[in-house]
Amino acid sequence: MIDVIIRHQASPLIESALVYQSITIIFGNAHLQSSFRKRNVILAAMMRTRIPGLVPRICQTPLPWKRPTQMTRVRYARWSTSHAVTWLETGHIDLKENEGLLFINNIFPSRLQWLLRGPLGGMRSYEAAVKRIDRPHLAASDTFQIIQRVVPKNLNVQVKEVVPRFREGGAFVKYTRPGDVNDADIEASIKENLKEHPIRPWFNPFQEVQVCRVIGRPWIEDLYRLPSPRLKVSFHPVSPEASAADLNTETLYTLFRPYGKIRDIETQPSDGKVTPRYAYVEFSRPKYAGMAKNCMHGFTIPEQEGGGKSGTRLKIKYERKIKLSMIKDWLLNHPRIVIPVLAALLAAITVTIFDPMRTFFIELKIKSTLQTEENGVMQWIRKQVNKANIIYFGRKGADPRGLTAIWEDRQEDITRLQSWLMENVETFIIIHGPRGSGKRELVLDRALVDYKYKIVIDCKQIQDARGDSAKIARAASQVGYRPVFSWMNSISSFIDLAAQGMIGTKAGFSETLDAQLSNIWQNTATALKKVTLEHRKKNDNDSHLTDEEYLEAHPELRPVVVIDNYLHNASESSVVYDKITEWAAGLTAGNIAHVIFLTTDVSYAKPLSKALPNSVFRTITLGDCSLEVGRKFVMSHLAYESKDGKTQPRRAEELEDLDACIEALGGRVTDLEFMAHRIEAGETPRGAVNRIIEQSASEILKMFLLTPETIEQSWTHEQAWYLIKRLAESKDGSLSYNEIVLSELFKENGEITLRALEHAELISIAAVNGCPQRIRPGKPVLRAVFKKVTENKALSSRMDLAIIAKKINKENKSIEKYEEELSLLGSLPRQPRELTDRIQWLLNKVYSSQNKIAKYEKESAYLQKILRSEH
């Protein structure tokens, strides 16, 4: 019958193997062994060749069959899932009568689990890895070989189940014993066997395998709880109605010392409110703590051993020591301390690592021009290119813009500026003049053309940038400050906002525009000082001087910082200009560099005086050139283009209106240059001037008359039109400053409005001894522009109507105020004699205002009639 079963099951190989194995284990006699030996070899060979991936290594062997031992049966049952499901689902190992439980440690490499499986892997992947790396033929390498060697052969026990605890490096071994043998004797025999025959696993040859009897009811769980040498022992009552005892240190020491060296025992304070009561037991090694936890968890201490009247049950779990995870928890739980400290560390790292790099790049920016000019290879290449250009294109003049006439007229200013740079005067140099007067060209192309070290900062680019990040990036690019993480400022602001919500105050991660600009200018000052001192030698005549004394003694060696467009689009509280002025004052006072300000704003003295209050500034004012110089400039420009071969020389009759056109344009360099370009393009001087006037008229209409008014605007359309009309009608092209301030449209904040219009370059204010005296057009050509704008009758009538409407509205408000006071005086029961003059004055005011209204209405009617007649 057994043969029939085997033959019937031989087709599916795996089922045949299982039936064969089961029958062999159940009927393990000699007849069956000899009957199935040949079938076993053939069946194993077929299973290896057909389905090797599904057959365990134990079956893939050519060796003859041997009767399975008890430990072999343990091996087969060990990797099955039926037992695992049982104790994982219940959390406990059920023990029947005559059954016991041992815990064996140091049989799994708990320290090397990260090599065997991922952090999210389960127990199954770990078992598979152990199967792959275990080598049964090596001593103490197979975990089941270790278990077999732990239990003495002469000990009459049968191993029923092995429950691994991979994280703790051990396993529970469930066994059955005869009725006349107790668990304590079995434990003693096993320990004696290990003492005589110690076992050292392959992964830890310096420590031995240890075994202890489980006297509690261990909790088998697969939670993510890592072993620790520190245990938390909680004292629970046996039943809900009973009470647990608070074990003292001596009792705990007696209970836990057999499992290993104890480092410390810490009991709960007597006044502690936490229940159940607990104590901390810290072992010297984690394996001792694992042994104690697995053997003592669930153990009930009887009354005679200090467990109280009804006994005390121990519940044990690992208490994690202060390691990285606890440091992380502490950091997360104390943001008021951590966030400011992180901000300080970040600032320290920035200063230590990035600031030297930034200073180095600024030095490269300062010396970039000089390095190119002094490089012999670059000089040779430049010379060869110039020779080739002369051969191919012909020799060109040295002044392509024809500015020689301008520089000859301003040679005195150039010489004065160069002499100031050789003097040791701790003050600013200011070059003031209207836009287009040639300030930048005079400084950079003439006065500083042969100067070694110079750096130019254009305030217009910084001030016109939108947002703090853009301003920081522009300022950094001006001086070569890199690396700059301007985009991090926005992210840091969000972090600061979140920190403010958590701790109530800002953490300081984000730096304000003020702080960022301070860092940029401070690094620039450091680079300027290094550049000046790098050529100083130890054996020169000034070697005995300190760096500060050396800088003071050699003003000719200092770099020059040119700050262009100073006070462009400035407001009352501009951080950009405040930091630049403060930094420039430090450069000047410390003899680090000469500072030259180029500005069109006449109020430059106010912010600069705050930075250097006790200094007298060196000032050069550039105005419009004279008629003679303007003619020379235009003619030299045209002569250069003729020599270049691009245009033919103009005949004298074609330039007969040149003087009149130059007089109409005035001496503004940019306007004269534009006219010269138009003449080169084939236009007559008069046509070029008309084109300039038309373009300027369009700009005036757009900026001051037709664009809707904004809150930031400090003037009204009516005020701008009033000045345009008055300047167009004036004989000498100027108005009295005091007369305009006292006019009806400028009585309220008149001076502020005039300064704003001057800043917008509609007008210019001429001062005598520091006091405003005359009002003129912003540039000479604007006088002709104003005349052209006022020739538009429709526009003129509409703007005059707006002015008259404002005047009528103002007089009506005055009459309302006078009438309110008259009504108040009329409500008195009797009229005192002292009020007669006041009443008469009010009546006269009402009469005067009413006459003005009547006059304005007549003018308004006339203007409306003109406006209706225009098509």
From Swiss-Prot:
Localization: Mitochondrion inner membrane
Name the UniProt record assigns to this protein: Mitochondrial escape protein 2
Bilayer-crossing regions: 337-357
Keyword entries, A-Z = Membrane, Mitochondrion, Mitochondrion inner membrane, mRNA processing, RNA-binding, Transit peptide, Transmembrane, Transmembrane helix
Similarity section: Belongs to the YME2 family.
Q: Can you tell which superkingdom this protein's organism belongs to?
A: Eukaryota
Q: Which GO terms describe its biological process?
A: mitochondrial genome maintenance; mRNA processing
